[in-house]
C-alpha cells in the first residue's frame, strides 16, 4: 500500500480526494493537513510515499512545502492537486510527479498512481544496474552465462562484444564465447571508460584498437591487437573520433 498525505485548506476537497484515493484500494491515507505548519509536522511524523498538495493554502502556498521536500534525502513524490492551471511550469521546476486539476477525476488519479509506481520501478532497476556495474568494475571480471554454466572473463582481455551469425559473441584475446546475455545487458555491465558501442551490433574495447581503416560511405573498420576486424557504422564514427581525439 502506498502511504499518502493530503494537504488542502478546504475540507470538502480533502474529503473528495481521500475518497477517490481509497477507492483505488492501493493507498493508505496516513494523514491530512490544511496548512504548511501542520503539513510539515505530518511529513516528519509519518513519512509518506506521496503528498497530494494544494497550491493555495490558508497560511502560505504549496510551493513552500515542495521546496522543503526537495532538500530532503529521500523525499516523497509531490502531486499538485489544485484548481489553478497556471502553475504547471513552476511545479515542473520543483520536480513534481504530477499536476492534477480540480474537480478530481478518479481515472486521472489512477493514472497518477501508475506513474508513481512506474517511476519507482525505474529507480530500482537503475540502482540494480549501477550496483551490478560497480561489482563488475571491482572484480575486473565479467560473468558470462554460457550454456548451463557461468564463465568469469577478465574484462581487460575482452576485444569486442558483437552479434556474429545471429549470436551474441564475446571475443577475448584467447577465446571466443557465445553468451545468453544480450548486447544491451553487456553494454551496461562493461566499464564505459574502456568499451564503446561502435555499431548497432558491436561494442569494442578501445584499448585493443591498433588501427582505424576507412571503409566505404563514411564507415570504418577497427583493426584490433589480436587481428580481429570490428565494423564502425556512420552513426557511431563521430563519437569514436571524438573519444580518440582524431
Curated annotation (Swiss-Prot):
Modification after translation (UniProt): Phosphorylated by LytS.
SUPFAM superfamilies xref list: CheY-like
Protein localization: Cytoplasm
Entry protein name: Sensory transduction protein LytT
Signal peptide: none
One of the record's GO cellular component terms: cytoplasm
Main location: cytoplasm
Gene Ontology MF terms: DNA binding; phosphorelay response regulator activity
Start and end residues of each HTH LytTR-type domain: 142-246
Gene3D superfamilies, per the entry: 2.20.25.10, 2.40.50.40, 3.40.50.2300
Keywords: Cytoplasm, DNA-binding, Phosphoprotein, Transcription, Transcription regulation, Two-component regulatory system
Gene: lytT
Pfam families attached to this UniProt entry: LytTR, Response_reg
SMART domains: LytTR, REC
Function: Member of the two-component regulatory system LytS/LytT that probably regulates genes involved in cell wall metabolism.
Domain of life where this protein originates: Bacteria
Domain Response regulatory: 3-117
List of residues that carry 4-aspartylphosphate: 54
